[in-house]
């Protein structure tokens, strides 16, 4: 079953009656109680402002959402609930029973993530020349949404005994546990647990998509039980994802299909400093060996794409020839053209975009290669499964005893690391939202909103 993600819609302001979930209890087969939640204790009152509006909220920060955390510092959430809902009040027509629950994560590069706050940024970074907008958390609160922002384990975490504790699928397990925590305490917590809206950017967008695609899947039940997650459902109402990194098994080929002709790069190196993700830009030019890898990956993409039997909204096949041209490329171009037309209609000056052809106020064509060249390459080939085991995704797919592993046959075959290992198929599969869509064992979120920046280089427009 193929789903056209761009046809999914999402309403952040939807409302519906809440359904009560189980009251606090012991997890079956365990003696440790699930984390408690008391709406009258453990919070601080604060004012949150955005867009000229101010709302008083109750803030619970550092709230554990599992009973046996592997990393207690990270497996916590920040919960913000408008005070009006404890007084029988309303915000924009929403009440304690009908307010949607906004679930933004702060995950970047599959690194460990702290819970978000009203003061911090939880959306995509602003475009060049634009000012930083208010945080999505602050905006959501002033519009009457309940906000639950979970922290999550990440790829760099290591226990004192040397065990790696944040490898795949740890972050997905944590987000699911957070959803279960909310449902577990639904009877005493304002907010509609049937209207949970996940949000994230880049790797966080990937995790948001994974959360929405894998609802209630039995594949992760053992991992959820191991950390002491609440029993019950973990499906959600809607997904909001900015430039999500998806379909990692095929993302290397997709990246070179788009960026293969771009030889210069500006890549981002990520590290952790004082529990904060640090980013540093590094510029350079591809070597001959890297170009050879790029060419091989680019050549492999059409065959994969054609196996998917993709079709546009009118039912027409979307395919590529051996050179990477065809109706699929035309379709991708049409999406960029439509976006440019929308910006033009809104008054944007696009005269500097030499790769656009504009006539009589209409965007009539796009030089795709020139457009991609203007965007520039961000990642070295292979973009995700590095042959030197040097990418964040290599570290993501490590194991409890091994820091980094390959996760594609191509990079394993071309590996530059003696003794390199390849991740098991199950782990790789669990981190691909496409695996769950169309399967009866998973409850897929009914509403999706996926956005990808015109000049975003984190992944290919194809995936």
Show which residues each predicted segment covers:
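Catalytic-loop region of hydrolases
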Residues: 26-98
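Cap/lid segment of the alpha/beta-hydrolase catalytic domain
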Residues: 107-172
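Short beta-strand element of the alpha/beta-hydrolase
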Residues: 97-108
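N-terminal secretory signal peptides and thylakoid transit peptides that target proteins
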Residues: 1-14
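Alpha/beta-hydrolase active-site loop
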Residues: 166-187
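Non-catalytic, alpha-helical, charged scaffold/linker segments
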Residues: 253-372
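Primarily recognizes the serine-hydrolase "nucleophile elbow" in alpha/beta-hydrolase
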Residues: 184-256
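C-terminal subdomain of alpha/beta-hydrolase-fold enzymes, centered on the catalytic histidine
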Residues: 343-463
């Amino acid at each position: 079953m193929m789903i056209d993600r761009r046809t999914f819609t999402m309403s952040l302001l939807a409302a519906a009656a809440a359904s009560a979930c189980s009251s606090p209890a012991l997890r079956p087969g365990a003696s440790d109680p699930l984390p408690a939640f008391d709406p009258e204790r453990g919070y601080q009152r604060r004012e949150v402002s955005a867009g000229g509006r101010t709302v008083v909220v109750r803030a619970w920060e550092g709230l554990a959402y599992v009973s046996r955390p592997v990393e207690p510092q990270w497996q916590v959430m920040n919960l913000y609930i408008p005070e009006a809902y404890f007084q029988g009040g309303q915000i924009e027509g929403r009440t304690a029973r009908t307010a949607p629950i906004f679930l933004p994560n702060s995950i970047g590069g599959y690194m460990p993530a702290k819970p978000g706050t009203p003061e911090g940024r939880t959306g995509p970074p602003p475009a060049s020349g634009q000012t930083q907008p208010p945080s999505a958390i602050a905006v959501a609160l002033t519009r009457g949404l309940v906000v639950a922002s979970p922290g999550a384990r990440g790829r760099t975490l290591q226990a004192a005994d040397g065990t790696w504790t944040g490898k795949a699928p740890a972050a997905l397990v944590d987000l699911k546990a957070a959803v279960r925590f909310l449902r577990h305490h639904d009877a005493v917590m304002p907010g509609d647990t049937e209207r949970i809206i996940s949000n994230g950017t880049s790797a966080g967008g990937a995790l948001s998509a994974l959360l929405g695609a894998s609802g209630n899947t039995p594949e992760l039940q053992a991992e959820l039980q191991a950390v002491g997650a609440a029993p019950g459902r973990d499906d959600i109402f809607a997904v909001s994802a900015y430039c999500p990194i998806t379909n990692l098994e095929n993302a290397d080929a997709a990246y070179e299909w788009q960026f293969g002709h771009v030889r210069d790069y500006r890549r981002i190196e990520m590290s952790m400093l004082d529990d904060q993700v640090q980013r540093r830009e590094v510029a350079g030019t591809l070597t001959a060996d890297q170009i050879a890898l790029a060419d091989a990956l680019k050549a492999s993409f059409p065959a994969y794409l054609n196996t998917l039997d993709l079709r546009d909204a009118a039912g027409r096949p979307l395919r590529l020839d051996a050179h990477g041209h065809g109706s699929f490329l035309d379709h991708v171009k049409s999406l960029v053209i439509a976006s440019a037309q929308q910006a033009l209609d809104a008054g944007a000056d696009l005269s500097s975009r030499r790769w656009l052809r504009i006539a009589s106020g209409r965007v009539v064509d796009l030089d795709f290669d020139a457009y991609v060249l203007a965007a520039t390459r961000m990642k070295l080939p292979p973009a995700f499964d590095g042959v030197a085991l040097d990418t964040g995704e290599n570290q993501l797919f490590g194991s409890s005893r091994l820091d980094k592993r390959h996760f594609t046959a191509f990079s394993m075959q071309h590996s530059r690391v003696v003794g390199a290992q390849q991740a098991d198929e199950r782990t790789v599969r669990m981190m691909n939202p496409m695996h769950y869509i169309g399967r009866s064992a998973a409850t897929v979120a009914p509403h999706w909103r996926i956005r990808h920046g015109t000049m975003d280089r984190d992944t290919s427009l194809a995936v």
